[in-house]
Amino acid sequence: MSRVLWTLWVLGAVTNLSKEEAPDQSSSLSCDPTGVCDGRSRSLNSMPSGLTAAVRSLDLSNNEITYIGNSDLRDCVNLKALRLESNGINTIEEESFLSLWSLEHLDLSYNLLSNLSSSWFRPLSSLKFLNLLGNPYKSLGETPLFSQLTNLRILKVGNIYSFTEIQDKDFAGLTFLEELEIDASNLQRYEPKSLKSIQNISYLALRMKQPVLLVEIFVDLSSSLKHLELRDTHLDTFHFSEASINETHTLVKKWTFRNVKVTDRSFTGVVRLLNYVSGVLEVEFEDCTLYGLGDFDIPDVDKIKNIGQIETLTVRRLHIPHFYSFYDMSSIYSLTEDVKRITVENSKVFLVPCLLSQHLKSLEYLDLSENLMVEEYLKNSACEDAWPSLQTLVLRQNHLASLERTGETLLTLKNLTNIDISKNSFHSMPETCQWPEKMKYLNLSSTRIHSVTGCIPKTLEILDVSNNNLNLFSLNLPQLKELYISRNKLMTLPDASLLPMLLVLKISRNAITTFSKEQLDSFHTLKTLEAGGNNFICSCEFLSFTQEQQALAKVLIDWPANYLCDSPSHVRGQQVQDVRLSVSECHRTALVSGMCCALFLLILLTEVLCHRFHGLWYMRMMWAWLQAKRKPRKAPSRDVCYDAFVSYSEHDSYWVENLLVQKLEHFNPPFKLCLHKRDFIPGKWIIDNIIDSIEKSRKTIFVLSENFVKSEWCKYELDFSHFRLFDENSDAAILILLEPIEKKAIPQRFCKLRKIMNTKTYLEWPTDDAQQEGFWLNLRTAIKS
C-alpha cells in the first residue's frame, strides 16, 4: 500500500512540475492596440490559446508549432494576416481556416506539409498573398487548390528537392496574378498548358536547375506573361529549336537571368530564343557566370531581327572565369545597333572595343560603374564615331585619376550631356579642362577633391560635388540650376551672385554654423534648400529668423528634424525650432548697456547723496580715526609740548589771538598754547598735524560758536581729532562757548560733540566785563587740572 501511495505522489509531483515549466502560450504574444500580435521566435510548440476577434495580424514564424486544429483560429474572424513560416507544421485540419474569410495574407512556407488540401483555402475568398514555398510536397495535390481564390495576386509554390511535377489542373481558376514564384529546381514532368490557364501574369520567377522544360513552360506563358525571371539555371546544355514554338507574338517585355550559368554555345541558343519571340524590350543578367571565351557562333546573323527590338541591356556582377582570354565579341556587334540603354556593372570591364562602340549607334545611356576603366583604355572606347547618340555616361567607381585627360577623352562624344565620374580618385583639379560642349550634368561626388576651379564647365545645369574636402565654393556658373555639395567642409552658403539661376541647393553635413534671411533672399530663384546636419550656433538672430519665417519650411525640405543646435552647450542636440533662449542671452548688448547706465546713475546718486549728507566727510573722518587708532593711545609725558591745543574757527581768530593768547601766554606762569596758524609744521599733512598737536597737548580747547560749526575747517579737518579724543573717554577737552548755540544748529555728524555738550560743563564767554576775570580764572584752573 505504501508503494502505491509513493508512486502516486511521484506522478503528481512530476505532473505539477511539468505544468510549472510549460510556458503560458497566450502570454508569449505581444499585441498592440490595433490588434497586431507578434509571437516570433518564442519557442512555441502549439498555437496560442485565447485568440479573439480583436486580432488583426498574427505572426508566429520561427517557432516549433507542428499542428493546427479546427478550433485554434475559430474566433479570429477579423484576421487579415497570418504568418506561420519556418515552423515544423505537418498537419492542418480541414476546417482550421474556416472562419478566416477576411484573411488577405497567409504564409505557410518552410514547414513540413507533404500534402496540400484544397479545403484549407476554400473559405479564404479575400486572400491576396499565399506562400507555400519550402514544404516537402511532390505536387500541388489531386484537386485544384486555388480555384476559389479569385482575389489572389501573389502566389509562391514549390521546393528545392521534392517538387517534381506541375499538372494541368494546378493553377485552374487563377485568371490574373501580379506575381507568381515557382521553385521547380528538381522539376521532372510538366503537363502541357498547365500554366496557360492564367490569362495574365505580370511577373514570374522560375527556379529550375535544368532547362529541359524551359521552352515548353515559356510557350504556355508567352501570351500572358510580361516579365520572366529565370533563377539558378544551368544553361550550359540549353539548345533552342524553332520547331518547338508555334506562336511568335508574345507579351513578354522583360527577361531576367539571375544566377544562371551560360556557355558560348548556350548563349547562342538564348539569342535565338530572344529573336524568335517578338516584343522583348529589356534583358537583364544578374550574378551570372559565362563559361567561355566569347566565341559566339551565331549563324545567319543577318536573319536575326526581333532581338533588335531590345532597348535595354543590364549586366550586373557577371563572372567570366577565363576573362583575360576573352574574345572581342565581334560576332554579336551587329545585334547591338538598336540598343538604347546598356548597364554593365561590377563585371571587371576595362575596355569597350572601338569597333563595338561604333556599332552602338542608338545608344543613349551607358553605365560602366564599378569596373576597371582608366583614361588610356577609355580613349580607345570613346574613339572617333563611337557612341554617336550617347547622352549619359556613367563611369562611377572606376580607376580614373585625371580630370583633364578624362574630359579630353570624351570630346569625341558630341551629344554627351550627362557625365557621372563619381567615386574615382582625382584628388586635385586643374585650372582649366575641356569637356563636350553640350555638358549639362556632372557628378564629381566622392572624388577626394580639395577645391573646385575653372575646370568645371560653365554650361552645367546640375553639379554634384558632395562628399569631398571642399571648404570654399566660389565658381561662377551662370546656368547652374541644381548644386549638390553635402558632406564637405564649407562654413557658409555659396555666393548667390555667382549662381543666379539656382533652384536646388543641398549643402547638408558641412561646417555651416548659421545663415541669415539676407543670404537666402539673395538666391532669387531658390526653391529647395537642404542644409540639415550642420553644427548650428543657435544665436538669438538665427533662432528668430528660422522660427518666425513660416515660409521657410517650404524651402527647407529637411526641416525641422535635421536642424539641431551645436551651441550654446545647454541646448546642444535640440531641434532649432524648439529652442528658446533667455532674455539675457538674446539681449546681452542692451543688458550690458542698461547695467552701465544703472551703474552710472548709481554713482551719480551716490555722489549727490554724499554731497547732501556729507558722506565724504564721514569717510575722511573714518580714515583719520583708523590712522589714529594705529598710534599709541597717549604720548609719553616727555613728548607733551603744549598745555593746550586750541581749535577754533577763522572767524573767531581775533578773540583767540588778541584775548585768549594774551591772557594765557602772558600769565605768570605762562601757558604754552598750540595754534594751527603758528605751530603746524609746513608741508605735513594737516590731519597728521592736528592729531600730533592734540597728542602733544595736555588739553584741547574748543572755541565754540556759530562760525565753528559752519566752518569747513572744522567740518573736514579738526573734527577728526575730536573723534579720537572723545573716543578715548578723556577729560582733556575744554569747551568755551563764545556765543549761545542752539543744539539744532549743531550738525548731526558732530554726534560726539553734541553728546559732550549734554554731559560736560562748558565755559561761557560773558559779555559783561566784570565777569570776564572770573572766566579767565576758571579757564586757567581747567587747564592746570
UniProtKB/Swiss-Prot annotation:
Residues 611-785 are cytoplasmic. LRR repeats lie at residues 54-77, 78-101, 102-125, 126-150, 151-175, 176-199, 200-223, 224-250, 251-278, 279-308, 309-337, 338-361, 362-388, 389-414, 415-437, 438-457, 458-478, 479-500, 501-524. Ubiquitinated at Lys-755 by PPP1R11, leading to its degradation. Deubiquitinated by USP2. Glycosylation of Asn-443 is critical for secretion of the N-terminal ectodomain of TLR2. Its main location: membrane. Residues 18-589 are extracellular. It is a single-pass type I membrane protein. Residues 1-17 form the signal peptide. The chain crosses the membrane at residues 590-610. Residues 525-579 form the LRRCT domain. One of its GO terms (molecular function) is NAD+ nucleosidase activity, cyclic ADP-ribose generating. The record marks F350 as: Interaction with bacterial lipopeptide. Residues 640-783 form the TIR domain. One of its GO terms (biological process) is cellular response to diacyl bacterial lipopeptide. Keywords: Cytoplasmic vesicle, Disulfide bond, Glycoprotein, Immunity, Inflammatory response, Innate immunity, Isopeptide bond, Leucine-rich repeat, Membrane, NAD, Receptor, Repeat, Signal, Transmembrane, Transmembrane helix, Ubl conjugation. It is found in: Membrane; Cytoplasmic vesicle, Phagosome membrane; Membrane raft. Disulfide bonds join C31-C37, C354-C383, C433-C455. Glycans are attached at N115, N200, N246, N415, N443. Gene3D superfamilies: Ribonuclease Inhibitor, Toll/interleukin-1 receptor homology (TIR) domain. A motif (ATG16L1-binding motif) lies at residues 762-779. There is a cross-link at K755 (Glycyl lysine isopeptide (Lys-Gly) (interchain with G-Cter in ubiquitin)). Cooperates with LY96 to mediate the innate immune response to bacterial lipoproteins and other microbial cell wall components. Cooperates with TLR1 or TLR6 to mediate the innate immune response to bacterial lipoproteins or lipopeptides. Acts via MYD88 and TRAF6, leading to NF-kappa-B activation, cytokine secretion and the inflammatory response. May also promote apoptosis in response to lipoproteins. Belongs to the Toll-like receptor family. PANTHER family: TOLL-LIKE RECEPTOR, TOLL-LIKE RECEPTOR 2. Ester-bound lipid substrates are bound through a crevice formed between the LRR 11 and LRR 12. This is Toll-like receptor 2.
